From Swiss-Prot:
NCBIfam families: rpsB_bact (TIGR01011). GO terms for biological process: translation. It holds the Pfam family Ribosomal_S2. GO terms for molecular function: structural constituent of ribosome. The keyword Ribonucleoprotein applies. It comes from Stutzerimonas stutzeri (strain A1501) (Pseudomonas stutzeri). This is Small ribosomal subunit protein uS2. It comes from the Bacteria. Keywords: Ribonucleoprotein, Ribosomal protein. HAMAP family: Ribosomal_uS2_B. Belongs to the universal ribosomal protein uS2 family. GO terms for cellular component: cytosolic small ribosomal subunit.
Amino acid sequence: MSQVTMRDMLKAGVHFGHQTRYWNPKMDKYIFGARNKIHIINLEKTLPMFNDALRFVEKLAAGKNKILFVGTKRSAGKIVREEAARCGSPYVDHRWLGGMLTNYKTIRASIKRLRELEAQSQDGTFEKLTKKEALMRTRDLEKLERSLGGIKDMGGLPDAMFVIDVDHERIAISEANKLGIPVIGVVDTNSSPEGVDYIIPGNDDAIRAVQLYLGSMADAVLRGRQNGAGGADEFVEEVASEAAQG
């Protein structure tokens, strides 16, 4: 597999944490020091951990498993959408709806409604409605597309979840934890790594850093799909045992 290098990380600013006064003591072992009251993340720790996460994702994708990309804050949403689409993975880029995983049955009903409205908007049904009714359905369609468009083809629960900014996506992580879905997460110096199976200590705000994480993850998914069609079953067992060992 093509690995991310220290140089890639330095150029993207992965090593710049948050102001020292906002630090989370649970991230202490990943912090190299401080400069101008900003914590500096130890990339000698981050680099192997990131490459481990990429290997895990590549192996998962080789077994035709689904990785859900999650990043709903403004700086991440657009890149999440683009990179997930590039590798054909489901994503949540707007807002995490409570129960997206733990109450998937209800979510599935909303996805069905989204598909019905999509079909109606294309088959001429909207044109036969009153202006008011057509407008209401168009608004419903837009709202559902914004919330669920990225997972409408997921077809069931994901096999792993990749999260940018674990603080911002704490509800998503707790839902994944409840269901035993492995979590890969970018954890900045102000965040807690709890509930994350594959920790990537790094800056979760800088656009170039976010692009590096997501671009590399999408590449890993594409490589895995390309490399593997066989051995999927043993492989899912291996992945499950890896996640259980933490």
